[in-house]
């Protein structure tokens, strides 16, 4: 006959999906957002020169605003181009 299934013996399943990325600008060893650090800013600019959205880079809202401001400031000082051809 059928055996009774004990719910306590069934292992818990992990939820399906990807893990949330960690914001690189938070934590103890986080780097500062600086408009003069062109190499760091280039990682958050697409191939066409647009600012990459936070849903892709996993930067939180507060740091995304700082990052966008730093990129715009670097563009005004001609450290990085406005658009890439």
Curated annotation (Swiss-Prot):
GO terms for biological process: translation. GO terms for cellular component: cytosolic small ribosomal subunit. One of its GO terms (molecular function) is structural constituent of ribosome. Pfam families: Ribosomal_S18. Keywords: Ribonucleoprotein, Ribosomal protein, RNA-binding, rRNA-binding. InterPro entries: Ribosomal_bS18, Ribosomal_bS18_CS, Ribosomal_bS18_sf. Gene3D superfamilies: Ribosomal protein S18. Part of the 30S ribosomal subunit. Forms a tight heterodimer with protein bS6. Binds as a heterodimer with protein bS6 to the central domain of the 16S rRNA, where it helps stabilize the platform of the 30S subunit. HAMAP family: Ribosomal_bS18. Belongs to the bacterial ribosomal protein bS18 family. This is Small ribosomal subunit protein bS18. It comes from Hyphomonas neptunium (strain ATCC 15444). The lineage of its organism: Bacteria, Pseudomonadati, Pseudomonadota, Alphaproteobacteria, Hyphomonadales. The gene is rpsR.
